[in-house]
């Protein structure tokens, strides 16, 4: 009898050990609460690994990182992943909640026909700021000048950070000059690069990892960051009852927008569980938690009734038609332009 019990325990342990889903996703996107809800439903374990930029994600995968089931790249990262033969085509028949996604987020240049990806949220790259300091200094956070104009930056020198991400920072500089965030024009790239070089001495750091905290505690006054991260910084400062308030806003020159999508790795150890997870995240109530908990924009129409009312008036979360017209989705630039941007970034970082 004891032998049978021991065998049962061993078999159960092995079964449970195999029922693991490996998630490779952005920092600060899906809350622990949502992950635990999925684990309870599927009676499985989710092991998550995080990254702070697409460059970091692609570098890890290029270096041979494996064993992931579901990944959550920005849309402009899908094309490189397909070219690297790292994704499997999706079986739409297994995704019964796919119908919930707003058609305007489907069938994009990044993935025509959504053969490989399903959008689950979006973020806007914009300015987050300390309301008290910005008001005191008479600065305008609705213009990219607060990040790129040396005359403006002189008032907040050492109190500004930008993402450590060439795709986002160069795109913002391009929009500042009225160019497309997806420009392939070498003259426009040079103008954006020169602007960043001129602004860099006034910045405290390139920071994609700790800028939420730095802004929320008052060490930094202005950041170029992601809308969902800045939602968290605003919430953290409020919860901590700081003597100042944090806010974030769109820029009048326009902003880059990135939709994040679920994909399944070509060598996924547990593809069945991957489909189950994606379908779970496409349910209206579960998708809404990404917005309610993390402040991300929501392409899922079934989620909107469950989004907290006060968030529906935040332009970076639910933009109106006029605001949407100034949001530009970032796309893959192709190898040649990508190299040019990376070379420009190296010049910027090395101070050449």
What is each of the regions a protein language model found here?
Residues 100, 189-198, 204, 242-263:
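Periplasmic-binding protein-like
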Residues 69-73, 204-205, 221-226:
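Paired acidic/hydrophobic, glycine-rich loop segments that form the ligand-binding mouth/hinge
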Residues 128-133, 175-178, 258-270, 289:
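A bilobed periplasmic-binding-protein/Venus flytrap-type ligand-binding module shared by bacterial periplasmic
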Residues 77-80, 222-243:
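A ligand-binding cleft/hinge motif common to bilobed small-molecule-binding domains
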């Amino acid at each position: 009898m004891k032998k049978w019990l021991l065998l049962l325990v061993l078999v159960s342990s092995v079964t449970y050990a195999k029922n693991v889903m490996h998630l490779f996703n952005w920092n600060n996107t899906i809350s622990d609460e949502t992950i635990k809800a999925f684990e309870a439903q599927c009676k499985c374990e989710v092991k998550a690994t995080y990254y702070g930029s697409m460059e970091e994600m692609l570098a890890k995968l290029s270096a041979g990182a494996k064993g992931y089931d579901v990944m959550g790249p920005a849309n402009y990262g899908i094309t490189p992943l397909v070219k690297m033969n790292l994704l499997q085509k999706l079986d739409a028949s297994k995704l019964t909640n796919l119908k919930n996604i707003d058609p305007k987020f489907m069938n994009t240049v990044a993935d025509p026909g959504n053969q490989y990806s399903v959008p689950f949220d979006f973020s806007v790259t914009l300015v987050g700021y300390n309301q008290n300091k910005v008001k005191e200094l008479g600065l305008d956070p609705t213009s990219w000048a607060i990040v790129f104009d040396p005359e403006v930056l002189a008032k907040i020198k050492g109190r500004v950070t930008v993402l450590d991400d060439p795709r986002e920072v160069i795109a913002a500089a391009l929009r500042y000059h009225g160019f497309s965030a997806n420009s392939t024009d070498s003259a426009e790239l040079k103008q954006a690069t020169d602007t960043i070089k001129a602004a860099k001495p006034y910045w405290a750091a390139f920071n994609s990892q700790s800028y939420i905290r730095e802004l929320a505690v008052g060490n930094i006054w202005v950041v170029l960051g992601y809308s969902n991260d800045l939602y968290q910084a605003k919430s953290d400062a409020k919860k901590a009852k700081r003597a100042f308030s944090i806010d974030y806003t769109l820029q009048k020159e326009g902003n880059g927008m990135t939709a994040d999508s679920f994909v399944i790795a070509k060598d996924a150890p547990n593809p069945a569980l991957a489909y189950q997870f994606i379908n779970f995240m496409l349910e209206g109530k579960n998708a809404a938690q990404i917005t309610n908990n993390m402040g991300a924009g929501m392409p899922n129409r079934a989620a909107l009734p469950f989004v907290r009312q006060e968030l529906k008036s935040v332009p970076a979360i639910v933009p109106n038609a006029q605001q949407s017209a100034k949001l530009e989705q970032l796309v893959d630039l192709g190898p040649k332009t990508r190299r040019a941007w990376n070379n420009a970034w190296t010049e910027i970082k090395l101070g050449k």
